[in-house]
Amino acid sequence: SHYCAEHVAALRKRVGEMREPPLGLEAVPNANLEILFDEILSAPTTGELLLGLYEVALPSLDDAMRKHLEDTNPLVDHPSVRVIRFAMLELGEMIALGQASIEAMVDEATRAKSSAWLGLLSDCLANAGGLGGEKEHANNTINRQHSAKPYTYDGVPRRDERFPDPYNMGVNAETFLYDDSFEPEPKTLMMFYKRLREIDVPEMMSSIIAETPDKPWEYYQDMSRQLWDEARHAMMGEVGFVNLGINWPSEVMVNHTWSLALNTQLTPEERHAVLYFIEQGLMPKTGKRFEWEVGMESDNPLSGLFQDYDWADEVLHSRIGRDWYVPAFGSTKEAIAYGDECWSRVLMDWNQYRDEGMTAHRNWWPGLYTAACKNWGIDPDPKVLGYSTSYESVRADLKTISASG
């Protein structure tokens, strides 16, 4: 989505260079294309979503761009040619990744079950004359399938088998990280965990984007970029553990309590407020700078590298918040205070999760630390091994949680 948002922004700018407004860029050029993308958006399974995106939509977009390059004059239309060439480089990357994902995740049974639906998508394209509308238009009968019922966003996170204990709040990473009595090396494990746990940020941000209509295109461009950054941060955490030879799905219990709570308890505006409040806490010396310093002091070069760019990304994210969230308030101070208030209203009841059998809040830290020590070739430090502080009474920003939740 980030790549496509960037490409669309560049093409919108190019159209604006050639024509006076109104440019009609929000108008759907053909009703069949609207059905095509409604169907893909409404795909009920990951397999169908992958097939619709990477075997139909993106290859068709690539074909339309290639056709424009073939038909246009590279001298008179050079600015467009340049934009399209850059876009096609990244389209190729997206299609290659999509094909690899399909090979890994879509079996023959899923493909066979999806054949009629894929035929519907092809019929939509044929009726529209292709994505660019330059081909002969067919006259196929179109009946909506997945989009017969209008799409509604579901804010409940859905994760696979790598996340077996999604309500586990048994290990408080922040109290360990800011404890001066612990050395940098074990702290890198907590930072890898924190990065991996950031998968909940794109889960939450996607809800803001999906449920915030009618903003300027630049809003969606910026928010999609930030969502992608947060997804990259989670990947950094995974890479950190893999680099240490640690099987993180069995050693690290990554919860979804934050994204679940925000998506189901707050409005999109309130979620954005919480996001901005947290971002402001990341910028002082006790935030991203501190994590970078810990990474640099450790013997793990990946940790320092990850924290360097994680910190850099947060500079941009803070600016995005100032552009799209803060203007609704009288001052930055008011905007931050509102975010704090919204987060304080979110209920993530540690005891309720345990009492209702959702999780035992197992302290998985000793197992992770022991596995890392084996990789490092050292004996576990008894004090580090004995760390057992949870999120029962202390929030991730180290604020005390009230007894009411």
Place the predicted regions along the sequence by residue.
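Non-heme di-metal
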Residues: S1-G405
